[in-house]
Amino acid sequence: MKSSIRQKLELLVDRLDEIDRMLSAPSTASDMDQFRKLSRERAEVEPVVVQFNAFRQAENDLAEAEAMLSDPDMREFAEEEMAAAKARLPELELELQKLLLPKDPNDERSVLLEIRAGTGGDESALFAGSLFRMYSRFAERQRWQVEVMSASESELGGYREIICRIAGNGAYSRLKFESGGHRVQRVPETETQGRIHTSACTVAVMPEVDEVEDVNLNPADLRIDTFRASGAGGQHINKTDSAVRITHLPTGIVAECQDGRSQHANKASALKVLAARIKDVQVRAQQAHISSTRKSLIGSGDRSERIRTYNFPQGRITDHRINLTLYKIAAIMDGDMDELLGALAAEHQADLLAELAEQN
């Protein structure tokens, strides 16, 4: 283990002792904010210290076994103990490195998922519907809630655009690698000659902002327009200007919602989408800066960047970022995304570990 990493770990051991002393102090017990803050920190530090203690125990076991080699009666036992300790140490060190990786502050958040039809006309809109179903089925498997916030349906089915909220702990950590261009190759239902068509959709995954106030939205910077809703949502909404469009004038970012039952509900939904989009722009700017200095699996923040191809005739899905091809397209489109998302998360973790090694 590198000395710089060991020093960090030894500091964390001392910090855990300090936290325990502070938590047991009467002054902390009477200050609930401080108590909660220290308790959260302890929950983050303790697993690292426990793992480091296991690593140090394996080091001690190895040293004791090496000391026994000079005893002929203990030599065979010592060699077995040495082999076991040497096998255990790299595993423990890797787990420690993973625990030391910086955590994405948005990982535990719910998400706003936006799917837009791109090139390919009606087939692209149908594919947007297929993608929405895929993510919805995946969310159901995680016991997450899916709420459609805004949808623009196409004439033949599917969506020109759909925005939904997926609520559940860790939703962003699982879905954040989905942002980008998704290309499909298949024979459309409207195709009479059996020719394969290529079309595309863009997906944006944005961490939900806890409160709209988390993003500094000055009311003077907002233009709010109302208009008559169209499409799904009930015929009664066409009689009033219940649909809402909000424009953030400094950035030109727009959000509109018309699926709610009232203007008030649509305004609240549009504000939530607008806040998430503004925060997403900020996050993507950070990602662009990061990707200029090192490889970033999430990408440069360019939504048009093609990340995945869905080839239905061949039954395969290829993720171009990690050169992974899976021949299980039916299962994945039905929400069985664990293998795909797990491979992306593992690659991202490997990138972070490589960066940690460079820093140390």
Curated annotation (Swiss-Prot):
SUPFAM superfamilies from the UniProt entry: Release factor
Pfam family, one: RF-1
GO molecular function per UniProt: translation release factor activity, codon specific
Organism, scientific name: Dechloromonas aromatica (strain RCB)
UniProt keywords, alphabetically: Cytoplasm, Methylation, Protein biosynthesis
Cellular component GO terms held in the UniProt record: cytoplasm
Major subcellular location class: cytoplasm
Protein name: Peptide chain release factor 1
UniProt-listed HAMAP family: Rel_fac_1 (MF_00093)
Keyword Plastid: no
PROSITE patterns: RF_PROK_I
PTM text: Methylated by PrmC. Methylation increases the termination efficiency of RF1.
